[in-house]
Structures are given as C-alpha cells and as structure tokens.
Amino acid sequence: MKTLFFATTNENKINEVKNILDIPNLNLIVPQNFNIKETGKTFKENSLLKAKALFEILNKNQNVFGEDSGLCIEALNLEPGIYSKRYDTYKLCKKLSTNEKNQLILDLMKNEKNRHAYFICNISYISKNRQISNFEGIIKGKIALSLNDDKNHGFGYDSIFLTKNNKKLSDLTLEEKNKISHRGIAFSKFKKFLLESLFNS
C-alpha cells in the first residue's frame, strides 16, 4: 500500500481526483483543516505552495501533491484566472454563492463577442526524496450566454463553460467530464507518472 497526501479541503476536487486516479493499493489521504493563502502569481506557483506547505507539516517524509486550477477568459484579460475561487471578493469585496459568481461572469461578458475561454489545472508533486514534478491540463471552450442550472453534475464555473461539443461541463456525468476536463487531463498524466515511479519503487 502506497500513501499519498493531497493538499486540499475541496470536497468536489477530492471526488474528481479519486475517480480519476483510482489506483489499487493507493491510500489517498486528505488533511483536516488544511488552509493556506494562495499568494502565487500563477497556477503552478500556487499548486507548489500548497504541496510545500503540506510537505513541511508532514515533517518532509511523505509523498504529497497540491493542485490549483481556474477559468481564464480571453475577453476579461484571462480573469478570473488564479482568483477563480475567490473572484467574488477580488472583484466585489463580498462573498457570493456559486450561481451568483457565475452570473457575475455572464454580466461582465454581456454583449461580448469573443467568448473564448479555457480551464487549466496544475499539479505539483513532492516525493519523499524531495523530487518535484509538475503536470498540467487544459480544456478550451467558450462562455455560455446564459446560466442553466437544471443539471448540476459539476461545480464552480462548470455551468457556464461550453465544451467544443457545445455541451456545458455541468451537463456531463463525473466520468464523462473527467475524460475531457483540465483536471482529468492533468491527473491522467499524474496517474501515469505514479504508476511508473511510486509503484515501481
């Protein structure tokens, strides 16, 4: 049995990651009350920041990884970007619900012809021997014209993001989403790496 620590407390991310990795004899542990300020200027910096913080907490003798992801919209100068999770407080200095955050994006995009956007996911892994590895996944698409929350398989900005097949990420099942999403792509690379390194050591 191999143990791997995930530097997050986001339940939605945990569920997606467990579904993607799905490696026999892998014990994925999520720390309780893990909270760290995301002060990095890029997704990579933030994912590494989380991984390093957890690595320190665990006395530098466990395999850990951190992940950072977000939505980048061309017409908004690639915002919300690294502020995706906290775009409400960044933009309006107040907390909004998920639907309200999605509506905020749609309001900012009102009458905007260029609706191109992409989701990005970055993973930073630190092994027991202090080797650092990085993995990234991107899905390109467009911002929808309206908010449709009839189906709610996803989370975050899934309900306003249209894939190349003109389907919202929120319309997909978890399995369907993980085959094409930024997180699915990044963690598939990470899974391959783990099987070749961690499980062959």
Swiss-Prot record:
EC number, UniProt record: 3.6.1.66
Give a GO molecular function annotation for the protein: nucleotide binding
Swiss-Prot/TrEMBL catalytic activity: XTP + H2O = XMP + diphosphate + H(+); dITP + H2O = dIMP + diphosphate + H(+); ITP + H2O = IMP + diphosphate + H(+)
Glycosyltransferase keyword on record:
no
Family, per entry: Belongs to the HAM1 NTPase family.
* PANTHER family tied to this protein: INOSINE TRIPHOSPHATE PYROPHOSPHATASE, INOSINE TRIPHOSPHATE PYROPHOSPHATASE/HAM1 PROTEIN
Protein's name in the database: dITP/XTP pyrophosphatase
**Species for this entry:** Borreliella afzelii (strain PKo)
Upper lineage:
Bacteria, Pseudomonadati, Spirochaetota, Spirochaetia, Spirochaetales
